[in-house]
């Protein structure tokens, strides 16, 4: 008989007084980068999971829900999208959704953490489905704020996967001050 003590568990708090537990089938990769602590493991219920600084970013069996909704409404509303930019998105699933549109000729992903992107390329092919090898994909490993301050074409659609606030790295999409509106 299987029981909870036979598994290694991952616990993620969802509120100060509540959380969710996942039984881990196997650990695939753990890595402390300059910017964050990354884990990739496989769970019994959700398949492979990408975790950054203790927060789940994507899980194999349900990531399509988030990534399709993030990308498809904007691209479907556009008459002919040609270029796109993704801020963050290390596992490649946002780029995957963008490249479903044949009119896209160039998709730039700006993700500060190249080590995480490389681990995702290696261990999460179910999520990125080979987009890193697509000639339309370009990847830059730099601070998105610095990149966005440089002049660029105004005709590029952009998406931010906006990671949770980290003590080590502030997301490029966060505001330096809270809005009171």
Predicted segments with their positions:
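N-terminal auxiliary segments of SAM/dcSAM-dependent transferases
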Residues: 1-49
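The AdoMet/dcAdoMet-binding core of the Class I SAM-like
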Residues: 2-10, 33, 58-181
């Amino acid at each position: 008989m299987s029981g909870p003590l036979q598994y290694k568990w991952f616990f993620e708090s969802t509120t100060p007084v509540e959380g969710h537990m996942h039984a881990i089938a196997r650990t695939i990769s753990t890595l402390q980068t300059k910017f964050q602590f990354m884990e990739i493991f496989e769970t019994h219920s959700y398949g492979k999971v990408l975790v950054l600084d203790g927060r789940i970013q994507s899980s194999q069996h349900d990531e399509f829900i988030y990534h399709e909704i993030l990308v498809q409404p904007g691209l479907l509303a556009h008459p002919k999208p040609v270029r796109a930019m993704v801020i963050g998105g290390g596992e490649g699933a946002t780029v995957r959704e963008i490249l479903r549109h044949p009119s896209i000729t160039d998709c730039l992903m700006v993700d500060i953490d190249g080590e995480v992107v490389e681990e995702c390329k290696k261990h999460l092919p179910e999520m990125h489905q080979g987009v890193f090898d697509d000639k339309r994909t370009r990847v830059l490993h730099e601070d998105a704020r610095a990149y966005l301050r440089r002049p660029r074409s105004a005709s590029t659609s952009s998406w931010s996967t906006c990671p949770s606030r980290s003590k080590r790295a502030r997301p490029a999409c966060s505001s330096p001050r809270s809005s009171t509106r």
